[in-house]
Amino acid sequence: MAKSPVLVTGGAGYIGSHAVLALKDGGWPVAVIDDLSNGTREVVPGDVPFYEGSIADRSLVGRIFVEQGTAAIMHFAGSIVVPESVEKPLLYYRNNTVGTHSLISAAVEAGVRHILFSSTAATYGAPARIPIDEQDPKEPINPYGASKLMTERMLSDSSAAYPLNYGALRYFNVAGADPGLRAGQIGRGSTHLIKIAVEAVVGKRDHVDVFGTDYPTNDGTCVRDYIHVSDLADAHVLALERLIERPDENLVLNCGYGTGLSVLEVLDAVDRVAVRPVRRETKPRRTGDPPELVASNRRLVETLAWTPRFADIDVIVTHALQWERKLQGLTAE
């Protein structure tokens, strides 16, 4: 198929930067817009056109569409920290929902036909059954999940009214780093468990907090479905191809491995990979954390013929730790 120009919003961020690499590796023309509030310019390859700014800047976005001949959008820009969303809900509705409204409006006006959206398992809230199917009730329990669900609804309504199709990929817990260490999670004050744990391994932290040990799970800690960021990036490219090939079809797909790991099981993996234990401290539950989130990925596998390459927690942790050590070396220079 012809590979049309793609605009990646939030392409200097963690997941977006890996999507940029996957697109480039696949021969897609790609450009990036990022306001650098959470992203890092250095992870965007030097030959990729980069625009510093907000997706809410209609004039800038419109200019990018013209200059790059944009045919499709991969949309990662937004705020993503669950506890912060509870403290600052209006920030999340502005950055995630209102910002995407502006982006969709600009796309419709310019005739950009395909949008692939970075959604989340947080749209499901605290699910009644595991694994979670895409058709299960969406009852988010924090503003982050609610803001993403509102965006999905905007995309659905827009696709019914305008010549536009969309995909919403509902991520579970994304971790790891590009195996070639071209990109990884940089994060300022990260709340991601594996990122925090490998920071502790290299001495950036002296311990890892375990939030809640009284959940109704095997060991009392939260259970999550961890997916390697490069496997997720591959899923994005496959989903984009599907949207372009089938312009009358929309996609809503869970992105996970369908396997749950508890906080303690993940920390055990970190200890194995690091060959030494990381100190743990037990803390009360965090507001907005459901006990268990595990995907049914049947539709993802069947619809996109997606085959993960890194579906092993030790591999995920190894790549995350290698990236963290690279960051530590860069900081020391």
At which residue positions do the language-model features occur?
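C-terminal substrate-binding subdomain of Rossmann-fold SDR/epimerase-dehydratase oxidoreductases
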Residues: 194, 202-333
